[in-house]
Regions:
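Sec-dependent N-terminal signal peptides
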Residues: 4-13
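Cyclophilin-like peptidyl-prolyl cis-trans isomerases
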Residues: 15-201
């Protein structure tokens, strides 16, 4: 009996230690619209460019918070639940970027729909920490996103930028540096624990 109680205590303590402190994550940030990706390696916080890419930001937020229906790739049925929580970073390349947002975990999945690009004049891949939509050609955005760790000017006008990392770029650096296979997939899964969204007024 005492042994079982001790095990339960340890599990409870671990769960409390793993609790996500949303206030701490967004503390100290100026007025704006933000998202945070909580991972095994730490938390990545980025500003959402709602003015420059309104459709893209709304799509990301609605999927993240479970406000939008998407097609489960395994059942073929439409579901309405939090999309990104529990997904992995399925593609990581050192000195380039980390990619996530595939419900199948192999880069071939999406939400079951596509939408058009949003290119805002002057918003380019001129710095690390750009958050953008992955695609397979013009106007094929869905749910997959990537975060850069270096300037990537060759991606200008090819991928919609909808955010900029403001905290946790070092976390992205850690993720892109993990051992990976020939497809650039991490040998040990890097999970998204939760995606948070916060508007600071």
């Amino acid at each position: 009996m005492k042994k079982n109680f001790f095990i339960l205590f340890i599990i409870s303590s671990f769960c409390l230690a793993q609790k996500i402190d949303e206030k701490k994550i967004f503390r100290g940030l100026p007025k704006g619209y933000y998202a945070a990706i909580v991972t095994d390696f730490g938390t990545i916080v980025f500003e959402l460019y709602e003015k420059q890419a309104p459709k893209t930001v709304k799509n990301f937020v609605d999927l993240a918070l479970g406000k939008k229906k998407w097609v489960d790739p395994y059942t073929g049925k439409k579901v309405k639940k939090r999309f990104y929580d529990g997904l992995i970073f399925h593609r990581v390349i050192p000195n380039f970027m980390a990619q996530t947002g595939c419900p199948k975990g192999d880069g071939t999945g999406g939400p079951g729909y596509e939408f058009e690009d949003e290119f805002y004049e002057g918003l380019i891949f001129d710095r690390p920490g750009r958050v953008a939509m992955a695609n397979r050609g013009p106007n094929t955005n869905g749910s997959q996103i990537f975060i850069t760790v270096v300037p990537t000017p060759w991606l200008n006008k090819r991928h919609t930028i909808f955010g900029q990392v403001v905290k946790g770029l070092d976390v992205v650096e850690k993720i892109v540096s993990v051992p990976r296979d020939f497809r650039d997939k991490p040998l040990s899964p890097v999970y998204i624990r939760k995606v948070l969204v916060k508007r600071i007024k």
